[in-house]
Amino acid sequence: MTEFINRLQKVASNPNAFKKTGRGIERETLRFTPGASLSTKPHPEGVGSALTHKYITTDFAESLLEFITPVSNDVDTVLKQLEDVHHYTVSHMGDEKLWPLSMPCFVTHDDDITLAQYGESNVGKLKTTYREGLKRRYGSVMQVISGVHFNFSFSTEFWDELFGEQSEDQRKESVSDAYFALIRNYYRFGWLIPYFFGASPALCSSFIQGRETSMDFESLGKTYYLPYATSLRLSDLGYTNDAQSNLKISLNSVNEYVDGLNKAIRTPSEEFAKIGLKEGDKHIQLNSNVLQIENELYAPIRPKRVAKSGERPSEALERDGVEYIEVRSLDVNPYSPIGVNEDQVRFLDMFLTWTVLSDSAPMNDSEMACWKDNWNKIIEKGRKPGLELKIGCQGERLTQKAWAERVFEDLLIIAKEMDRVNGDDAYQQTHKRLSAMIDDPELTISGRLLAETKAAGGIGVIGCKLAVEHRETHLAHQYRFYTKQELDTEVERSVQAQKEIEANDKLSFSEYLEEYFSYLK
């Protein structure tokens, strides 16, 4: 019996080990006008304060909405919550629509994009200044790429069965070590996510206007594409940061990770120092270090813990270890009105369970570089028949199909255990549908989207068509989890909460920044 099977049988002996898995979803999407341009309107007043609303906020830009679900133990519940907040928001957007693709179209210049605004409080100004810094460092167009983030945690019962009796400190350390083992395996095998769910094989020419690229694009009118690409969002064209490439933050333990993060937020950048900190009285970045704050660290997956008020993410991890992980490699699913579907959630349930129960040796920088090379191959040509990937750095190779089939043998065992606990066959059905995509790459989201893009004459045409369809779906939606009254109440609460924060400020913004960044001294 393999160690993986042994561990799986241990946790599966307790039905609540799987039933109490925690999941939350964050979905980003741009508002755009009937004339197919980026919205220049403020955040819709009818959905409350972007600073304080629990479920509806903004990301980089005022037009870049972000929908957030609370943590749920039920797959159906988390999707219902997402549907409800989409319906509520679209109902307050007039004739504007939500862009259904990860890569923006019709955006040609940084000046087209208004930074997200959070009011007059110091914390609100901090959020906007941070975004001003991102704009000056990397440009705004790159920052309005949309994605879906999946937050995931194993249950207390899962850890109880896996580790047995432990003291509180032992448990904290074991759980953190297990999550970092998962993260290392995610880098080794997570290329399966863009293979199945990558949804950006093509982009509007406006996105790369004036940008250098070594990619050998084919063109279709104003659309550029790579014939076998899966997720250009995850490529060098998407959200990457050259300044961060030298950070090499260790993923071997929570202490090493926190040390690396602390170093990064304290490392000065000559390049960013040239930007300056102020223009007149206006703050244009929070500081000139490699990372202004820890959230600037780009990663396809992050270890997380809910932070206390005033606590940095790394301080929360240092205090009590890893609580959950945030998967950040999902493109927006253009075929789902909410940007993600049940098969994706169920696949991640199975895959993340497999990554934590499988062996996961420590990883050095050179091994990480080899695994990242596999990701880049899948991102740029993942559907190419016979594409070979490295097995570590040893020179051995395996086709993406053969490797996916091997992983899926283990995932089927997990699917059967999860279905046994739940009394249905939902995970096995997901496994079956995705297995078909291993056999035929054109069934993947990127394969389907590229075929439809070619038939329609461009990616912008597809985006506009799907946006209209999804808007109709959202407007016709009936509440399935929340009530309208509950969401109305949250709007009122958020507006009041922002007013209270603004009224309670005692420091000037400059004083506030000095106090906020006192840890850098």
Swiss-Prot record:
Its EC number is 6.3.2.2. GO terms for cellular component: cytosol. Keywords: ATP-binding, Glutathione biosynthesis, Ligase, Nucleotide-binding. InterPro entries: Gln_synth/guanido_kin_cat_dom, Glu_cys_ligase, Glut_cys_ligase. Gene3D superfamilies: 3.30.590.20. One of its GO terms (molecular function) is glutamate-cysteine ligase activity. Pfam families: Glu_cys_ligase. GO terms for biological process: glutathione biosynthetic process. Pathway: Sulfur metabolism; glutathione biosynthesis; glutathione from L-cysteine and L-glutamate: step 1/2. It is an enzyme of class 6 (ligase). SUPFAM superfamilies: Glutamine synthetase/guanido kinase (SSF55931). It catalyses: L-cysteine + L-glutamate + ATP = gamma-L-glutamyl-L-cysteine + ADP + phosphate + H(+). NCBIfam families: glu_cys_ligase (TIGR01434). PANTHER family: GLUTAMATE--CYSTEINE LIGASE. Belongs to the glutamate--cysteine ligase type 1 family. Type 1 subfamily. This is Glutamate--cysteine ligase. It comes from Aliivibrio fischeri (strain MJ11). The lineage of its organism: Bacteria, Pseudomonadati, Pseudomonadota, Gammaproteobacteria, Vibrionales. The gene is gshA.
